[in-house]
Structure formats: structure tokens, C-alpha cells
UniProtKB/Swiss-Prot annotation:
Its cofactor is Mn(2+). Keywords: Amino-acid biosynthesis, Branched-chain amino acid biosynthesis, Cytoplasm, Leucine biosynthesis, Manganese, Metal-binding, Transferase. GO terms for cellular component: cytoplasm. This is 2-isopropylmalate synthase. Residues 408-546 are annotated as: Regulatory domain. Belongs to the alpha-IPM synthase/homocitrate synthase family. LeuA type 1 subfamily. The keyword Secreted does not apply. PANTHER family: 2-ISOPROPYLMALATE SYNTHASE 1, CHLOROPLASTIC-RELATED, HOMOCITRATE SYNTHASE-RELATED. Transmembrane segments: none annotated. It catalyses: 3-methyl-2-oxobutanoate + acetyl-CoA + H2O = (2S)-2-isopropylmalate + CoA + H(+). The gene is leuA.
């Protein structure tokens, strides 16, 4: 049997695999904000990125290692392909972390070996011990992944795993890379690994999976029943294609059905000991932060964190819930931190009162960020009678989200109606030339007119592919959250903003997306799975401090 920590370890890969969602690119400040919140959430491991990908990724992993990792905090992990240059860059990035891990991988399925790596099984059996041993010479905590394990020949898989453990791997990850397997198959795969790998008791078995068939969470729970003790997941289930296994769904399944799962951990069914170290009351806030910063909206009927997760429309259901919530709810909304507390703050409230409430909510802002957030709070308080925690979350998350900006909104005004053509006048500041320019444009609606005017000024080719707006809270004076996604050269960029005036929010969201596009074009990135290893070997990003 594999090494058993006595509970499930939660390995969060939102900042690595989650960020590979189209349009979900994050800047350094956003990654730090998410990493800090993941630490508050109580995850065991944060996979902070792929350091070899770009100088920006290296810097983000390095900074997270420096300020988020701690003796009592999460392990900070970096991803590296099975190459010396990748592993070296990863090690240099995670050096500041008191608890650090190198996560290296190579494909083991025949389809990947033939068509992607163009290597033989013999080649893999030579590479694995060499690269794992090299990583082990740098740090003690080594995770090794057999990419596309669920489509690999089992006998070859056992051989690779045994070699990796012999060479120093302390965690063995079994990925369902393309979301191909079913729960019973995945559970059997983990069972068979435990049965057929002689030294498996020297490593923790981890699982990683994608949701292409909608089975990722079910697969993971079956894997846990069969000995997997680390689950690799993302907030809101974001990730490439159909996404990854959802952290909140996994954690709450283990929380709500603890009496069922306890026996698979050698416990009595009524054992009160939690199966994970997650602070469930932080789930909703973490979900909202990731959604706001990535621009990836959560579907309303998403389990645990969707807007409708605790809503009841049917009269019969409403009646039952009013009499006893347990009739139709298996989770108390407060367990996941869902509340809409109205706070006694208004336009006369001072900076210290706002800071105190933000600290109660778990936000620790710098003096500069607090000043900016307070200014936005005062502006909102002048326009909105009641301020909720949700309003404060929107203010803070937007403050964190602001990307590097070449263009900033100075002024926007629209004219529209049933008998007039929607017209927008927009003035933007170019931060490079320190000049302001104004344009007037006509569109099919006020938002379209605003975007047309901005495009005339910015002159950055793009195609607007998504515009969405939602109310942060109830009431006609509620903040409106706008998310805009644009495309350029087959890449997608997101912008997000909130304001009581949705036209102003739309203008800022569009400019945020444009700024991301502009600055991302200056950064060359490597994809850990799709880019050819040999062609990228020459490109090494070293620690800027060295």
C-alpha cells in the first residue's frame, strides 16, 4: 500500500494548470493574491507555475515562494519537464520557500511517446531515473508524474513508477490527462498500482485529471477509495479544455459524506476528524476571487459555488426549506462562507473602519492598495445606500486585478435611446506618452459604441468575443460586474471591472483586456505539454538574483 498521510492532501494547481484556460492569464499581483488566499484556504500544496515557461512565470513562482510559503504554510511547487534545464529553473525559482517541491513529468502512453516525444519506452526508462535523481539532488520533496497514465500500458507504467521511487520520488502522480477514464477504471488503476509496484509504500499516490467527460471529481473520489491520498485540483474546476477536477466539489463531497469515506482511511464511520485540512468557510471567497481575477465566470448551477447552489424556486422546496433547511439542503451555506452581510459602513465611515472590516474578511492590503480601495469605497457609498461584504470583495478584487496599463480611462459619455444612434465619447490616457486623446464613435448599442471609440484610439487589433454583466448584489443601485473577452491571433484575453454604471465598467473592462493583450505580446511563453522539449532546451531562465 502507498504511503498514507492519514487524510487527503489537497494539491492546488489553479496558478499553473488553471491559468492555461483560454483568456485566464494572470499578472504577478493577481497570482500573489490568489496564492495568499489559497494559503488561507488551507491547501497543502500550491503549484505556483512552470518556471521555465517565461521570465514572468519564473518571477511569479519565485515571489510566491518568498512571501506565501512558510514553515506552517503550504508547500510551494514548481512544474518541470524531465530535462535538466527545466528542473534547474524550477529549483532556482522555489529556493526561497521553506517547504518546496519539484514536480517533474514525462509521458508514458504509447500515443504520446510516438507522436509527441518521438521516444521509445527504453528512452523513457533511461530518462526517468536520471532526471528524478537530479531533482532529488536539489530538494528532498520530489513529485513525478506519468503523463497520460490512464492510457498507458499498465505493466510499463508499473516499471516507470518503480524506477521513479527508487530514484527519489516521494509522490507519484497518476494523471488522466485527457479525461478519458471512468470512475471504476480509475479506481482499479490505483488499486493495481498499489498491488503491483513493490516500493509503492515509499511514496504518496496522487491523481490529476481533466473533465472532458464530466467525470473528474467522480474519478478522484474512486481513486481516494483505492489508496490515492493527494488530489490535484483547481478552484472552480478551471483548466484547459473542459477544466480540471473542482477543489470545492472534492472537498465538500469528502466533508458531507465523511461517514461514508472514513472507512477507506481506516477510521470508524463516526470519526469526527476532517478528511482534508481545508477551511471550508473560505471556499466562496476563494471562488469569487479566482473568477474575478481570471475573468472566468462561474456557471449559476455550479455545485457548491454557483449563484443557484443554495437557491430554491419550487414552492414545495421553498416550503420545506422554510420549515427545516435539511429537507432540501445537504450543506449549510455558511459552511462554505456564503453570506451577504450588510455592514454599518457608509459615506461617513473612516479608513480605519474599512480596513478593520477588510481584515475581518481576510484581506491584508498594502497602504497604497488600501488608499485606492478606500477611495473606491467612498465613491460607491455616495451612490449606494447599503454596502455589503460582496461589494467590498468586488472593490478589492478589481483593485488587485488591474494589469500593467498603457491605456487608462479618463472620461466616457454615451448618448442613446429608442430614436437615436448610440454614440460614445471616450477619452483615454496613454501612460507611455502621457497624453490624452478623445474619440467619438457610433455603435449598435452604448457598449459597442464605447468599444469602437477605444479601438480608434488604441489601434490594437482585436475581436470582441464575449461581453457579460451581472449584478453583485440585489437592488437597482447594485454594482454591475462586467467581463469582456477579446481575441487576437487565436489567443484570448479577459478584462473585468465593476461599477454602478455598467457603461463605465464596460469601458474599464475593455481597456483591461487590451492592456493584457499589449503586455502579453512582449512575453514569450512555453507550454509544458505542447512545446517541443529539444527546441526549448537552449532557453533557460535563471534566478534574477544570481
Amino acid at each position: 500500500m502507498s504511503k498514507d498521510p492519514g487524510r487527503i492532501l489537497i494539491f492546488d494547481t489553479t496558478l499553473r494548470d488553471g491559468e492555461q484556460s483560454p483568456g485566464a492569464s494572470l499578472n504577478l499581483e493577481e497570482k500573489l493574491a490568489i496564492a495568499h488566499q489559497l494559503a488561507r484556504l488551507g491547501v497543502d500544496v500550491i503549484e505556483a507555475g512552470f518556471p521555465f515557461a517565461s521570465p514572468g512565470d519564473f518571477k511569479a513562482v519565485n515571489k510566491i515562494s518568498e512571501v506565501v510559503g512558510g514553515e506552517n504554510g503550504p508547500i510551494i511547487c514548481g512544474l518541470a519537464r524531465a530535462s535538466t534545464s527545466d528542473i534547474k529553473a524550477c529549483y532556482e525559482a522555489i529556493i526561497p520557500a521553506p517547504k518546496k517541491r519539484i514536480h517533474t513529468f514525462i509521458a508514458t502512453s504509447d500515443i504520446h511517446l510516438k507522436h509527441k516525444l518521438r521516444k521509445s519506452r527504453k528512452d523513457v526508462l533511461s530518462i526517468v531515473p536520471e532526471m528524478v535523481s537530479y531533482a532529488k539532488s536539489l530538494v528532498d520533496d520530489i513529485e513525478f508524474s506519468c503523463e497520460d497514465a490512464s492510457r498507458s500500458d499498465p505493466e510499463f507504467l508499473y516499471e516507470v513508477i518503480q524506477l521513479a521511487i527508487t530514484s527519489g520520488a516521494t509522490t507519484i502522480n497518476i494523471p488522466d490527462t485527457v479525461g478519458f477514464t471512468t470512475p471504476s477504471e480509475f479506481g482499479k488503476l490505483i488499486f493495481d498500482i498499489n498491488k503491483n509496484v513493490p516500493n509503492i509504500d515509499e511514496a504518496v499516490i496522487s491523481v490529476h485529471g481533466h473533465n472532458d467527460l464530466g467525470l473528474a471529481v467522480a474519478n478522484f473520489l474512486e481513486a481516494a477509495k483505492n489508496g490515492a491520498r493527494q488530489l490535484e485540483c483547481t478552484i472552480n474546476g478551471i483548466g484547459e479544455r473542459a477544466g480540471n477536477a473542482s477543489l470545492e466539489e472534492l472537498v465538500m463531497a469528502l466533508h458531507v459524506r465523511k461517514s461514508f469515506f472514513n472507512s477507506f482511511f481506516g477510521r470508524s464511520s463516526d470519526s469526527p476528524t476532517p478528511l482534508t485540512a481545508i477551511r471550508t468557510e473560505e471556499i466562496t471567497k476563494t471562488s469569487r476571487l479566482v473568477s474575478n481575477l481570471t475573468g472566468m465566470n462561474v456557471q449559476p448551477n455550479k455545485a457548491i459555488v454557483g449563484a443557484n447552489a443554495f437557491a430554491h424556486e419550487s414552492g414545495i422546496h421553498q416550503d420545506g426549506v422554510l420549515k427545516n433547511r435539511l429537507t432540501y439542503e445537504i450543506i449549510d451555506a455558511k459552511t462554505v462562507g456564503l453570506n451577504d452581510n450588510k455592514i454599518s459602513l457608509g459615506k461617513l465611515s473612516g479608513r480605519s473602519a474599512v480596513r478593520a472590516r477588510l481584515e475581518e474578511m481576510g484581506y491584508d492590503l498594502s497602504r497604497e492598495d488600501l488608499n485606492d480601495a478606500f477611495a473606491r469605497f467612498k465613491d460607491l457609498a455616495d451612490r449606494k445606500r447599503e454596502i455589503t461584504d460582496r461589494d467590498l470583495e468586488a472593490i478589492v478584487s478589481e483593485q488587485v486585478q488591474l494589469p500593467e496599463s498603457r491605456f487608462q480611462l479618463s472620461h466616457v459619455q454615451v448618448s442613446c435611446g429608442s430614436t437615436s444612434k448610440p454614440t460614445a465619447t471616450v477619452t483615454i490616457l496613454n501612460t507611455e506618452t502621457h497624453t490624452e486623446d478623445t474619440s467619438v464613435a457610433i455603435g449598435t448599442g452604448p457598449v459597442d459604441a464605447v468599444c469602437e471609440a477605444i479601438n480608434e484610439l488604441a489601434k490594437v487589433p482585436n475581436e470582441l468575443i464575449e461581453f457579460s454583466v451581472k449584478s453583485v448584489t440585489e437592488g437597482i443601485d447594485a454594482l454591475g460586474e462586467v467581463t469582456i473577452r477579446i481575441r487576437n491571433k487565436n489567443k484570448i484575453y479577459s478584462g473585468h471591472s465593476a461599477d454602478t454604471d455598467v457603461v463605465v465598467a464596460a469601458a474599464n473592462a475593455f481597456l483591461n483586456a487590451l492592456n493584457r493583450l499589449i503586455f502579453s505580446e512582449k512575453k514569450e511563453c512555453i507550454h509544458p505539454q505542447f512545446d517541443n522539449l529539444e527546441n526549448s532546451e537552449k532557453k533557460v531562465f535563471s534566478n534574477p538574483k544570481n
